[in-house]
């Protein structure tokens, strides 16, 4: 597809906008990934290496921006925006999305939100709050620059508005513009993954918006929502944030489920094993995933009954998730199981890494274990296996499987693609697998220094990060 000079601001075609979402995703994701390479360069050995002692807040600023960019500006625009915009009307038999101009506006809001978040680095101390923006650190006028927190909040608000507009667009398209005779019961798994994701966004994003606006008013308008000195409660913000933050994980991964299901089904010319159960499993994941946000807060002093409920419900999510994994494997086994295309290989890698990441999530879901492993590198290893490896491989699978549609070129049989896949996979495994052992050795996250005894594992992690960088250069 040829994109002319002004098509970014004048085009309302869903395919063109989907391609722009993908380009923005890779552009923003490259920036976020390079920030993570800086972090791993700092952590390749104990003591401070490339960050000066008097400027150690730079480390906090880097991992804050890295987290926000990779979640809100890499995975979401790529999988939800790119895959959704390009394929949802096609899968519904609709000529176009319901509101093409609103779709165009939501795309144009993405770079604006990205620039706002990046501007926080230009403030005096930067926004070193972590991507969670916890008070009282984010509301303190003494330890940080409030301007940095302001622009991060505005960036998240703009990104949230764009996501809500896309969600309304997708749901309206499916409900009112699908082809005649195409009932909801026979829609594909990919379509349902986008519908459920849109519903979760509409449910949870207003709560995040309310939470960050309360932060903003605490900073500038003398409210005391989160100030315990005046009967405020910083734990309230954690509830508001994680009510969005945990469903956000499923918002990121559900479109990847749709992509993987579509790729496995089409590459092997097989119907998905248990097609309806796959849709039901995604619905169960969405409902249960919205009811377990407190498992991020086991160390905040919860009652025993509360911890028991959230532990059991968290572990319960493994049932529908396991259903999906077994159905994918059964679909593979009903075929000749050959690696027909690179997208088939990437799909298999996704299943392996997502299963491993989900298994460590079941371990962390146990309140007694999580108290010991909370805020250690075990947590980082867990969610990077699901997101950094799982969702990102889902994004690359999208590009690999549909490159004919996107670019009019077919590189599936190119050996460089297989080389890139293996180099990237080995790199990310080397990066994140040793972090489990660092977590068991109680290495705290968000700290740029650590004991000399942990040098070996950290060196392996940094080597893996460098391998991943070379793999991505090959992909480019």
Swiss-Prot record:
Describe its assembly. Component of the cytochrome c oxidase (complex IV, CIV), a multisubunit enzyme composed of a catalytic core of 3 subunits and several supernumerary subunits. The complex exists as a monomer or a dimer and forms supercomplexes (SCs) in the inner mitochondrial membrane with ubiquinol-cytochrome c oxidoreductase (cytochrome b-c1 complex, complex III, CIII).
Positions with a binding annotation for Fe(II)-heme a: 66, 384
Key words, A-Z? Calcium, Copper, Electron transport, Heme, Iron, Magnesium, Membrane, Metal-binding, Mitochondrion, Mitochondrion inner membrane, Respiratory chain, Translocase, Transmembrane, Transmembrane helix, Transport
Q: Where does Ca(2+) bind?
A: 42, 448
> Alphabetically, which GO biological process terms does the record hold?
electron transport coupled proton transport; mitochondrial electron transport, cytochrome c to oxygen
What's the record's note on cofactor binding? Binds 2 heme A groups non-covalently per subunit.
The molecular function GO annotations come to: cytochrome-c oxidase activity; heme binding; metal ion binding
Q: Where on this chain does Mg(2+) bind? A: 374-375
Translocase: is it a keyword of this entry? yes
Question: Chief localization class?
Answer: mitochondrion
Summarizing the function annotation, the protein's role is: Component of the cytochrome c oxidase, the last enzyme in the mitochondrial electron transport chain which drives oxidative phosphorylation. The respiratory chain contains 3 multisubunit complexes succinate dehydrogenase (complex II, CII), ubiquinol-cytochrome c oxidoreductase (cytochrome b-c1 complex, complex III, CIII) and cytochrome c oxidase (complex IV, CIV), that cooperate to transfer electrons derived from NADH and succinate to molecular oxygen, creating an electrochemical gradient over the inner membrane that drives transmembrane transport and the ATP synthase.
The protein here is known as: Cytochrome c oxidase subunit 1
Residues bound to Cu cation are 246, 295-296
UniProt keyword annotation of Iron present = yes
Q: In which pathway does it act?
A: Energy metabolism; oxidative phosphorylation
Q: State the organism's lineage.
A: Eukaryota, Sar, Alveolata, Apicomplexa, Aconoidasida
The residues that cross the membrane are 19-39, 61-81, 105-125, 151-171, 194-214, 240-260, 278-298, 310-330, 345-365, 379-399, 415-435, 455-475
Check the record and name the Gene3D superfamilies matching this protein: Cytochrome c oxidase-like, subunit I domain
Q: Give membrane topology per the record.
A: Multi-pass membrane protein
Cellular component aspect of the GO annotation: mitochondrial inner membrane; respiratory chain complex IV
Name the reaction it catalyses: 4 Fe(II)-[cytochrome c] + O2 + 8 H(+)(in) = 4 Fe(III)-[cytochrome c] + 2 H2O + 4 H(+)(out)
* Top-level taxon in the UniProt lineage: Eukaryota
| Co-factor requirement | heme; Cu cation
Where is the protein situated, by its record's location annotation? Answer: Mitochondrion inner membrane
Family, similarity comment: Belongs to the heme-copper respiratory oxidase family.
Report the source organism: Plasmodium falciparum
EC number(s) on file:
7.1.1.9
Cross-link 1'-histidyl-3'-tyrosine (His-Tyr): where in chain: 246-250
